[in-house]
Curated annotation (Swiss-Prot):
Pathway(s) of this molecule: Amino-acid degradation; L-phenylalanine degradation; acetoacetate and fumarate from L-phenylalanine: step 6/6
Top-level division of the source organism's lineage: Eukaryota
Organism: Oryza sativa subsp. japonica (Rice)
Family from the record: Belongs to the FAH family.
Record gene name: FAH
Keyword presence, Hydrolase: yes
Protein name as it appears in the record: Fumarylacetoacetase
Residues binding substrate, per UniProt: R155, Q253, T363
Length: 429
């Protein structure tokens, strides 16, 4: 039976009602077993309930019978890059096979206790790793609400959004080497800040450390150098999405940005969630994308102009508090430029994308105050405070843990992303 928002699929693996990872999801990641007598290499997996399904073990057991995966070594690799490069036919074959062997009425894994124990690893026994080797990382700037607010803060109300913003998806080249997996601590960065009066620029730990609520798209096959990807073929090159926190040092960023854009204010750390939710799993949650005025140029005009209804939340847990507090709620559907428009624009000059490349949406702010996706907007660059439990914040303090989460609500099930977390540590001496 075809999947949909009313899918009757059930797994023999017990999945709690509120779980992010039912059989309708099956996001891909890479893990290492904790506590093994001998160090084990990283292994690809999908999440199902509170378990990681070891895809190397599934492959070794001969459970992939399809023409593309039966003889492929892609799930014996330490990252997902080889699998990503195989393209949508292989992704669909993998998803269909995994949903079949995990379904409640399929005995091949359900009734084989030894194989089941080998393949299903409790999440509590796993160390989640960065699931891909990120060759290149591009950060876009695609929320009109975020663009407008930043313009007001830094340039005033006259022209808060530059005219080119409505003509093309604005982006910049990020730093792939500092993309890290959820749970990795963040050392407060040092850099130059804006001079005050006649003084020289300030140098030291950032005084305006911020989070940015974003999502990152992971590239599949990609394209040859010099050969752009057509807008209406772009979805074939997007494997899935991860939650992303584009940590930002606003004082460093503000001083360095003119004329070439962000550098040290962004490049110190970018955190992503460990599970990649596939576009196939997100298909039931498509929604109409915002109307674009003026109409985009022909190379950005797509037949299927859609976004995804993905609710997102930001929580902060101060060091002195036992529980986190929610500080923002937004939604992916507010994105002005779609993922496919971002990818088509990225390649229109002939730039080649490769399997495992990553491009991010920019801060996913919405129209309401509660939907602003960073402290820069929530505090209007530190001009006001927000409540965080029984504390207040203008920017992040040492010991703060930032928790991003996202989850789509289907009919009787969720398709979630888990969490994307990081704790701020003091700057080095």
């Amino acid at each position: 039976m075809a999947e949909g928002s009313r899918s009757p699929l059930r797994s023999f693996v017990e999945v709690a009602p509120g779980s992010h990872f039912p059989i309708q999801n099956l996001p891909f990641g890479v893990f290492r077993r904790r506590g093994s007598p001998e160090p084990e290499p990283p292994r690809p997996a999908v999440a199902i309930g509170d378990f990681a399904l070891d895809l190397a073990a599934v492959s070794d057991a001969g459970l992939f019978h399809g023409p593309l995966l039966s003889a492929s070594p892609c799930f014996r690799q330490e990252t997902l890059n080889m699998f990503l490069g195989m393209g949508r036919p292989a992704w669909k074959e993998a998803r269909a096979t995994l949903q079949k062997i995990l379904s409640a009425d399929e005995p091949v894994l359900r009734d084989n206790e030894a194989l089941k124990k080998k393949c299903l690893v409790p999440m509590s026994d796993t160390e989640m790793l960065l699931p891909i080797t990120v060759g290149d990382y591009t950060d876009f700037f695609c929320s009109v609400h975020h663009a407008r607010n930043c313009g007001f803060i830094f340039r005033g109300p006259q022209t808060p959004v530059n005219p080119n913003w409505f003509q093309l998806p604005v982006g910049y080249h990020g730093r792939a080497s500092s993309v890290i997996v959820s749970g990795t601590d963040i050392i407060r960065p040092k850099g130059q800040g804006h001079p005050t009066g006649d003084s020289r620029p300030y140098f030291g730990p950032s005084k305006k450390l911020d989070f940015e609520l974003e999502m990152a798209a992971i590239v599949g096959p990609g394209n040859e150098l010099g050969k752009p990807i057509d807008i209406n073929d772009a979805e074939e090159h997007i494997f899935g999405l991860m939650i992303m926190n584009d940590w930002s040092a606003r004082d460093i960023q503000a001083w360095e940005t003119i004329p070439l854009g962000p550098f040290l204010g962004k490049s110190f750390s970018t955190t992503v969630s460990p599970w990649i939710v596939t576009m196939d799993a997100l298909k039931p949650f498509t929604c109409e994308a915002p109307k674009q005025e003026p109409e985009p140029l022909p190379y950005l005009a797509e037949k299927n102009h859609v976004n995804y209804d993905i609710p997102l939340e930001v929580w902060i847990k101060p060091k002195e508090q036992s529980e986190p507090s929610m500080v923002a709620k937004s939604n992916f559907k507010h994105l002005y430029w779609t993922l496919t428009q971002q990818l088509a624009h990225h390649t229109v000059n002939g730039c080649n994308l490769r399997p495992g490349d990553m491009f991010a949406t920019g801060t996913l702010s919405g129209p309401e105050t509660e939907s602003l996706g960073c402290l820069l907007e929530l505090t209007w660059n530190g001009q006001k405070e927000i409540s965080v439990g029984n504390s207040t914040r203008k920017f992040l303090e040492d010991g703060d843990e930032v928790i991003l989460t996202a989850c789509c609500k289907g009919e009787g099930y969720n398709v979630g992303f888990g969490t994307c977390t990081g704790k701020v540590l003091p700057a080095l001496p």
